[in-house]
Amino acid sequence: MARELKLGYKASAEQFAPRELVELAVATESHGFDSATVSDHFQPWRYNGGHAPFSLAWMTAVGERTQRLQLGTSVLTPTFRYNPAVTAQAFATMGCLYPGRIFLGVGTGEALNEIATGYIGEWPEFKERFARLRESVRLMRELWTGERVDFEGEYYRTQGAAIYDVPEGGIPVYIAAGGAVVAKYAGRAGDGFICTSGKGEELYSGKLIPAVREGAALAERSFDDIDRMIEIKISYDPDPDKALENTRFWAPLSLTPEQKHSIHDPIEMERAADELPIEQVAKRWIVASDPDEAVEKVADYVGWGLNHLVFHAPGHDQKRFLELFKTDLEPRLRKLG
């Protein structure tokens, strides 16, 4: 049985202050959204005009003021500045407070957030970061059983550790992947899979989704048991000039992974991003002023196998986006399911 189509809102913690970010997420429940996800940055992409509220405080604030909205991180790194055992405790508590609504989205991490908070030495290559992620997920899942856990891993250890307040069934873990190796792991071990838009059909239909399928098959799981989430970067506005200009704040996302890998200072990140022309920045986004055109481009991702569409709008006027989403996009998007 195919997964149901879900529509989500990306709460841009790098762009908005804590109170505004909470109010926007609360409003999504009456504007056609099923979920709200939040980024987890210690530092923003931009030094000037940037923000970085604490994701878990945001989740509890939104959880208290909503009734059905699914809430999660997209994504948190439970391996460096966060201890995985403490991360497991935090999400277990939220799972008890908001039953069936909390998930933990995880990734391998970025230097921008970890070096400033005390990581010593050269920033690890992917192999180590991925190994840490896998080990942390194993540990957290053991702790969510509620039993005492003695864990001896390569990176993490616990002695008689137990989480005393755990929701039934634990917490769903969504694994973010930009390539086939981690996507295969998501299919094998994740309750959900997360990727981002704007990188070409071959990545999604030729690499990521087949890898998720392969991982699921190896674990003797159903592909349809995995919630397949994509953050869709969309700048929709009836005014085409505004739709294009709104993407400028998020120029750092258009830097290559190689460019971003070693940058750990938001001032340097901002400088590198602002050297990019607006045309290059906009390539990562669906930039549209016609709702049918916008939804037609979104429909490609559904056709490639994604079912949980989380919309990241780049403009500063998010209330305008929520209204446009409700009137222009949501009715059309629901027909994709």
UniProtKB/Swiss-Prot annotation:
Substrate binds at T196, K199, K260, R284. It is an enzyme of class 1 (oxidoreductase). Coenzyme F420-(gamma-Glu)n binds at D40, T77, T108, G109, N113, G178, G179, V181, V182. Keywords: Carbohydrate metabolism, Oxidoreductase. It comes from the Bacteria. The keyword Cell cycle does not apply. It catalyses: oxidized coenzyme F420-(gamma-L-Glu)(n) + D-glucose 6-phosphate + H(+) = 6-phospho-D-glucono-1,5-lactone + reduced coenzyme F420-(gamma-L-Glu)(n). The active site is at H41, E110. Its EC number is 1.1.98.2. GO terms for biological process: carbohydrate metabolic process. It holds the Pfam family Bac_luciferase. GO terms for molecular function: coenzyme F420 binding; glucose-6-phosphate dehydrogenase (coenzyme F420) activity; oxidoreductase activity, acting on paired donors, with incorporation or reduction of molecular oxygen. Homodimer. Catalyzes the coenzyme F420-dependent oxidation of glucose 6-phosphate (G6P) to 6-phosphogluconolactone. Appears to have a role in resistance to oxidative stress, via its consumption of G6P that serves as a source of reducing power to combat oxidative stress in mycobacteria. PANTHER family: 5,10-METHYLENETETRAHYDROMETHANOPTERIN REDUCTASE, PTHR43244. NCBIfam families: F420_G6P_DH, F420_G6P_family. Belongs to the F420-dependent glucose-6-phosphate dehydrogenase family. This is F420-dependent glucose-6-phosphate dehydrogenase. It comes from Mycobacteroides abscessus (strain ATCC 19977 / DSM 44196 / CCUG 20993 / CIP 104536 / JCM 13569 / NCTC 13031 / TMC 1543 / L948) (Mycobacterium abscessus).
